[in-house]
Amino acid sequence: PYTTLFRSMVESKETDENYKVLKENRERLQDLRTVKGEKVEVIELEMPNAIEVKDWRLPRLPASYANFMLINNGLFIPTFKQKKKDAIAEEVICELFPGRELMTYDGKDFVMEGGALHCISMHQPK
């Protein structure tokens, strides 16, 4: 049983359209408990800066570092050509999955279609 959750948060930009709802999500998670009553640790994972593509059907791309994926011994993390934020996200996620081989991929092409690797993988239990 896992007692760690991810949640994304806009990097303290109160003017960002996602700020309010992500702050509310964080507040809700503060009181979350497991079925055994144990407190859940909430790991903050910052959102990348907004990615907008002119004349695209999505005015703002749904970019998120939480769209990572575990495959065998690998850890695939999307990047968004935001050097500082990409590095911070990699550090946070890699700490949670020690010993896995890190592989990054440019997530922009994926999120232009509405999701990234995790979204399109169709996870199936064995």
Predicted regions and their residues:
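Short, small-residue-biased leader/transition segments that mark boundaries at the very start
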Residues: P1-L5
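The feature marks the mature, well-folded catalytic cores of soluble enzymes
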Residues: F6-K126
